[in-house]
Design a protein with these regions (language model features):
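General N-terminal leader/first-domain-start detector
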Residues: 1-6
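Active-site nucleotide/adenylate-binding loops and adjacent lid/helix of ATP-dependent enzymes
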Residues: 7-142
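Long, well-ordered mid-to-C-terminal structural blocks that present hydrophobic/aromatic surfaces
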Residues: 143-147
Length: 147
């Protein structure tokens, strides 16, 4: 099977479907995150998005202010709908990086920087800029992914 889109990867690599679960991925990376129905532990800006989104492109994602004092409301899905989760909001550059596997390690091959002019639209970037691939120290479990 030729893997072009996320739905192809879902079918081709069932052992790695956890990667499509963005809540699980966020928690594995140590981010402050939780599912709809679980209150935040810190007041601040969060990204709210579907737990699963095989369409990609940030569909359904939006920036939202969440407050620890909204505990009861959040427990009753007043701010986060079922099937969605919240995760701490990150600032800084947005990279899209292609990796290749070399000697059982994932190394960056190509990269672009996505430019947003506003946080109001998380689906599309205003433009992309090709850059030299940045190097990030990936968690050990990432290198165990063998596709």
């Amino acid at each position: 099977m030729k893997v072009i889109d996320d739905h192809h990867a879902w079918e081709a690599y069932p052992d790695y479907r956890f990667i499509f679960n963005k809540l699980e991925l966020s928690l594995r990376l140590g981010y402050h995150a939780g599912p709809g129905g679980v209150p935040v532990q810190r007041t601040g800006w969060y990204i709210v998005r579907p737990v699963y989104n095989p369409y990609g492109m940030g569909i359904g994602a939006h920036k939202k202010w969440l407050d620890v004092d909204w505990h009861d409301d959040m427990s009753n899905h007043a701010h986060i709908p079922p099937g969605y989760f919240w995760c701490e909001w990150f600032t800084g550059k947005h990279y899209s990086i292609d990796y290749k596997r070399v000697d059982n390690l994932w190394i960056p091959l190509n990269a672009c920087e996505g430019i947003h002019e506003t946080d109001d639209n998380l689906i599309k970037f205003n433009h992309w800029r090709i850059i030299n691939p940045p190097y990030f120290n990936l968690p050990d479990w990432v290198h165990d992914i063998d596709v």
